Amino acid sequence: MALLLPEFDPADVRAGRDLIHRLTADAAGIQRGVLREILSRNSGTEYLRRFLGGAAGDDDDVRDAFKRRVPVSGYEDVKPYVDRVASGGEPSSALLCSDPITCLSRSSGTSGGQQKLLPSTAEELDRKVFFYAVQALVRNMSLHTDHGEDDDGGGGEGMYLMFAFHGDRTLSGLPIQSALTTYYHSRQFQECDIGGFDKCTSPLEAILCPYGEQSMYCQLLCGLLHRCRVDRVGASFAAGLVRGIKFLENHWEEMCFNIRSGQLSDWITHTPLRDAVTGQYLQGSNPALADEIASECARKPWDGIVRRLWPRARYIRTIVTGSMSQYIPILEVYGGGLPLVSPIYASTECAAGINLRPLDPPSHVSYALLPNIAYFEFLEVMDENGEKVQGTTRLDDNLGEVKVVDLVDVKVGRCYELIVTTFAGLYRYRVGDLFTVSGFYNATPLFHFSGRHDVILSIDYEKISEEDLLNAIAETDKFHLRPLGYMLVGSTAYADISTLPGHYILFWELTNTCDSNVAIDIDQTAMEKCCLAVEDHFDEMYRKIRHRGSISALEIRILSHGAFDALMDFFVSRGTSASQYKTPTAIRSKEAMMVLEERVVGRFFSQATPSCRSAEFERR
């Protein structure tokens, strides 16, 4: 265990550089060791015995047997075992992994549309500690270099929004909750500086508060009270940070009253939270600070509000890759030029990706998968020419003889789907996340997160990937919305087949950049141009089908203020963790669509068909 998860001090930058070099220079050797350790521990489990029997021999023999006999799997392969673990009728250590399963981690369900319960063990918390320690090390190496080689940058604090909510329990008493909630409640997290190797303005009682609105209010209030100490601002995901800023916009006057009077609002009723805020932060009236904050918040628009409220802030730290990329423009406005740092790639299956060049612009962010966290394989999805590899387009595909390659054998420019084998009992498991290889750091590949396999829009033969949709929206936002003074706050899509032919619907919430108010009175011609611009960015197959009339015109529906907050509340009410929530790029649930439909204030359609080369050829 110590060899795979070496202890180190994230504040010791010199030693940290050596650690990262060792991890990335010998990725192949470390990966062999990880697989050897996983198989030696778990070969007696029911799942592996089905395929490996009593496979023995040297490392190469066992590795070859693993690759030949253990099939690539998906959630439906694992679910029967998870159900048996949940029922508690037999020892969990006999089913998937030799260590007792201590928790079932619940995925958000907003990426692929399906919530999943995945096994986790006590040891997984140690891996998370190592993972976040490496993240802190990279931060100290790249973002706080002026503090010196052996200084932890301790002069500043992070104003991070973090939330842990109580989950459910299985019949056998196992907790069911998000991976982040498990981590925040753990001894490992609470024994570190609050924030996990990261001094944070939020008291632990705010992070663990079960009431989301009270938690959000007090975390922002504490961040304002410590505004002169804050040198970084963030949240796990960009959607959560934008939500926090909009919350602040609606509550800053009340917070200023709290600061001016030294009294916390009566509606903060959670006793541990109230005691922590009044005992540690709000210890008397401070009219001068209240006036400073009010002066900045009263200025409209809110361009640069993060930099203005936290003048020492060096950067914004939040995940802005994948579906979160839609929030880059609005965060750039709120940040007023602060760099957007997308620090990690993490999924419920495993947290493993570190951004080793955190100051790269968001569009160029790449992650290195730490080779000691899990065993990684990759299923090729596209070659370097952008051509799809047959048989790998859906999670339920029969892979046949399609080749799966190891971490160090991927090729630059090619797109792959991530497959993981974990200590906690996932074997050759398809995560559903797509990565394009952008280069190498020593012997370890760097991956650009390209989206998900199973988040697509499709009505006829066309298939719109998450990346296709996000790129189309980003270009339309850049060239059609922002020049008119509009800013996209939230977006999701829905394939509507309630009428024939079906069509795509984009739900957008906009603000006016001049005063930060909700944009409702919008020019019809401008929005019709946006509809066509999105369609023009879709692929040739979509445009061909549009010309044939098998899909009707794309529609944009403009939403009232708070619509995407309501969508989050809908998903949270159905078990999604608020801390892991990501606004879905596309929704499939009719119920979720109706949450947005109730808040529609404008409807616009393409008034022309998108350009199509093949249609022009057919007319000739």
Curated annotation (Swiss-Prot):
GO terms under cellular component: cytoplasm
Keywords: Ligase
Top-rank taxon: Eukaryota
Enzyme class: ligase
Enzyme Commission code: 6.3.2.-
Induction remarks: At low level by auxin.
Transmembrane segments: none
GO molecular function: acid-amino acid ligase activity
Keyword Secreted attributed: no
Pfam family, one: GH3
A biological process from GO: response to light stimulus
Ranges in a coiled coil: none
Tissue: Ubiquitous.
Family that this chain belongs to: Belongs to the IAA-amido conjugating enzyme family.
Functional description taken from the UniProt entry: May catalyze the synthesis of indole-3-acetic acid (IAA)-amino acid conjugates, providing a mechanism for the plant to cope with the presence of excess auxin.
Protein name (record): Probable indole-3-acetic acid-amido synthetase GH3.7
